[in-house]
Amino acid sequence: MITGIQITKAANDDLLNSFWLLDSEKGEARCIAAKAGFAEDEVVAVNKLGEIEYREIPMEVKPEVRVEGGQHLNVNVLRRETLEDAVKHPEKYPQLTIRVSGYAVRFNSLTPEQQRDVIARTFTESL
């Protein structure tokens, strides 16, 4: 479990009023802010801090999103004939919405060139 602390008493004056994250499972402390002697984000064994007294600091943990490469997939569930008919008869499909490069757009609001491009990219004969 991670606990946020502010050191209120320490033999080492550089630690006084410093802020740390204590990882009780690993027996480590990560420096958040200190006057001197410790760098921001430096991780040390808790026993390296020596004899200390501290008060717990409430923490708000926000989920972290990590993106490591990855893929992007747009899925449009319809038939090629539907889009081709929408090109010829847009009045029949005023609400036809498709995904294009990560956003939703009404098919009829695209230019004719964009519509042809969507049809060409969306439907393939094989992978």
UniProtKB/Swiss-Prot annotation:
The modification Glycine radical is found at residue 102. One of its GO terms (molecular function) is formate C-acetyltransferase activity. One of its GO terms (cellular component) is cytosol. The keyword Electron transport does not apply. Residues 5-127 form the Glycine radical domain. It comes from the Bacteria. Acts as a radical domain for damaged PFL and possibly other radical proteins. This is Autonomous glycyl radical cofactor. It comes from Citrobacter koseri (strain ATCC BAA-895 / CDC 4225-83 / SGSC4696). The lineage of its organism: Bacteria, Pseudomonadati, Pseudomonadota, Gammaproteobacteria, Enterobacterales.
